[in-house]
Amino acid sequence: MAITDIKKKPTLKSNGSAVVKKTTTTSIAAAPKKSTLTEKPKQIVKKVIKKQEEKEVKEEEEEEVKEEIKKEIKKEIKNEELDEDSLLEKEEEEKEIEEFINNTNQKKSEEEEKKYENVTFESLGVHPQIIDACNKLGFNKPKEIQRESIPWALKGRDIIGLAQTGSGKTAAFVIPVLQKLLEAPQGLFCLALAPTRELAYQIADQFNAIGSTIGVKTCVLVGGIDSMSQSLALAKKPHVVVGSPGRVLHHLEHTKGFNLRSIKYFIMDEADRLFSADFEEEVNNILKVIPKERNTYLFSATMTSKVAKLQRASLVNPVKVQVASKYQTVDTLLQQYLFVPFKYKDCYLAYILNELAGNLTIIFTSTCASSTKIAMMLRNLGFGAIPINGDMDQGKRLASLNKFKQGTKSILVATDVAARGLDIPSVDLVINYDVPTNSKEYVHRVGRTARAGNSGRAITIVTQYDVEMYQRIEFVLKKKLDSFPCQEETVLIFLERVQEAHRIATNELKDKNYSSSSDRHSGDSEGSIDINKRKVIKKVHKKKKY
């Protein structure tokens, strides 16, 4: 006959104190030997937490801490024979310890928030005139990247800034530059480089907005605009010059009287992109003609780890301000994927847009022709879509962007020209029609939504040919994405209409002298990968159109 014993087992609360639970166990004779593990979880946790505090473990190292705890537990139970009940107890204790660590880290983050609760632009040392401009723009409190970088910048240090997209990076370098300009005004005070035309205009807009109270003058130097009008603007000695490397170098070589020998500040926004082969020659030539006695700021959402590349920018004792891991997306972003058959890719795109109608959406494609064709196809289906890509002249690109910002068109079909730096806070949805070829581009693409604390959604369409690239992205992000729910039967209801819209778009493109053979439409990602591989083998670096 079985004997029922009432045993008391200590468990761990989130605050670290032990409570007693009553558990009922059944045995044939005497109770089995109780695992010594049950008496030690609290001591183990305390020991590891102490190590955590000593090492000042950061948020991204939480997993390492948890692994350390598990190793400690394994040491405790080594050479010990555990029965089924003891194994269950061990699992429960591991869960309790993990919960304890999570609660501890949560408390630490809450304490940090309280610590920075009273931090203001004034306490950071920002000039009252600039604070007034920030308040008018709704910048009432400094963001994390601004809190960390502005004090160092005002002390005259070079800065490498790494922060998530939409976290206020632009203002983090604009504010200190304007403050130093206010203290010692001069023409051609600052040069800011950006990899795309749209980002250059956005940086200039930020300088104009925050510098409105001090009368700052800016000049934008990008391709697609008449260089003569830019030369006339340079002749007026603007305080800040913002441009793409190619056009800045063009004016250095061809505009009489223009030089950068007097600049005090040199900024590279989206610095990792500017260090790539596409801009290497131009950036190196610009670095040769600017003074060594200057302050340099490098900012990006993803940053190269190659020290040699950073050294080319001639940084002097730089401060690294990092408020995000190398490849990190914001917590307010819902990231999903949709695995689809290659031949039904367009049909699934139409289904997603129909299901999530009413959202301001950016669709990313891998080629310019694909961007134009998909926009045409979606318009034929009744969606308000407009393209933006490197094949369009600057006037048309800005017109597309303005229509999208104003809400006249709700869908922007873009190449990676729109992936970096564009700040449109109201974007609700990002769709990766073509899987990005690397994790950096994924981070920048999905960073167009969920900006400045807002929520957003990103959906990546994955075909059978994209699985390896997609898995690589998940591996680097250290995150498994959820699947976007849908039924194929429901999706295929759109098939006939989508095929007809695609046929009409193809004919329209032929009329505009687009070569369909160079596009392959849905196969863009495959084709572009093969082309890129051949380019690497031949070591021929053709510049992308930005």
From Swiss-Prot:
Residue stretches of biased makeup (Basic and acidic residues): 512-524
Domain Helicase ATP-binding, first and last residues per copy: 150-321
Protein name stated in the entry: Probable ATP-dependent RNA helicase ddx47
Keyword set, alphabetical order: ATP-binding, Helicase, Hydrolase, Nucleotide-binding, Nucleus, Ribosome biogenesis, RNA-binding, rRNA processing
Gene Ontology MF, one: RNA binding
Motif Q motif: positions: 119-147
Residues where ATP binds: 163-170
InterPro entries recorded: DDX47/Rrp3_DEADc, DEAD/DEAH_box_helicase_dom, DEAD_box_RNA_helicase, Helicase_ATP-bd, Helicase_C-like, P-loop_NTPase, RNA-helicase_DEAD-box_CS, RNA_helicase_DEAD_Q_motif
Protein family: Belongs to the DEAD box helicase family. DDX47/RRP3 subfamily.
Listed GO CC annotations: nucleolus; nucleus
Motif (DEAD box): 269-272
One of the GO BP terms on file: rRNA processing
Job description of the protein: Probable ATP-dependent RNA helicase which may be involved in ribosome biogenesis.
Free-text domain note: The Q motif is unique to and characteristic of the DEAD box family of RNA helicases and controls ATP binding and hydrolysis.
SMART domains xref list: DEXDc, HELICc
Helicase C-terminal domain span: 348-492
UniProt keyword annotation of rRNA-binding present: no
Pfam families in UniProt: DEAD (PF00270), Helicase_C (PF00271)
Top enzyme class: hydrolase
Compositional bias (Polar residues): 12-21
